Amino acid sequence: MKKQEQKNKTVFHAVAALLAVLAVVLVLYGGGRWLEKRAEKPETRTQLPQADQETVEVDGVTYRKKSRLTAILVMGVDHDTQDSYEYRKAGQADFLRLVVLDDADKTVQQLQIDRDTMTPVTVLGLLGDRYEPVTQQICLGYAFGDGRQTSCEVTVEAVENLLGGQTIDQYLAMGLDGISTLNDLAGGVTVTLEDDFSAIDPAMTKGTTLTLQGEQAETYVRSRCSVGVGTNEARMARQESYIKQLSVQLDEKLQKDQNFAVDAYDALQPYLTTSMAKGQLVNEAWAAKDYTRLDTIKPDGTYQVGEDGFMEFYPDADALQQAVLQLFYEKVE
């Protein structure tokens, strides 16, 4: 019981970091493509440290599992919030970021997970029956669930598969219809447009400096094909700079007013699905402002177009192994 209370406290201490990380769920990719079953592809990953390994040796260096961690999966989903969803139409988890909280070192570190990462994903039947995992884009697992808890759990399982079975303790997902609310909670974010968005919003011309309000934020972070070079890589770079500024503004508001956590949660709640309780989050929010945020881990990898015409991302084996070690292990001196 004491161990569980300590783990819960770790989660709730970091709500301020989570409010900032909520910014990343703006990385939403319009799609609605058919979720066809993907053929199995051979895996090329280096052997990852498994969750039940307390120590592991890599390249002659011994690593020990960190003991005071909490891992939270944050998801951005390409659906509008509603009470229920048809089978396979719950939306895709187009943004995935794992937030790992270290209560011993008082740090927060994030792992950026590409939506097109190929990994075993559990498939659910129409009545909820579970079938053998199929190697497919990790974003697709969400669609097989109910658009809420089941979808989140399937996605959590897929990320755990990707990371060699490392445990994810909590999850938080937000629908795209919460974008405007989140942006405006921060008071709007000022950006200088390096691409032209005027085909979508006449006020958003290249070179203009403006404070994004409401739907402008959605346009800025979601647009891809009709903007600039049209690549997902370019869009991710644009989103990352936006997220950093939004995070700063959310932090400033929480520093000044502890009740901001309450207001933010209440405003965003209609768009959220989470395993974390509001009351506990709000009560412990104030302590989170002192957590140090480490650089986001972004594993290298290879993109290719699959047989079905959709993009696939295969993370570099060594990069993924190093990410797991950095997040969940520490060197034994």
Residue ranges and their predicted role:
Residues 2, 8-19, 25-333:
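Non-catalytic, solvent-exposed segments at the cell envelope interface
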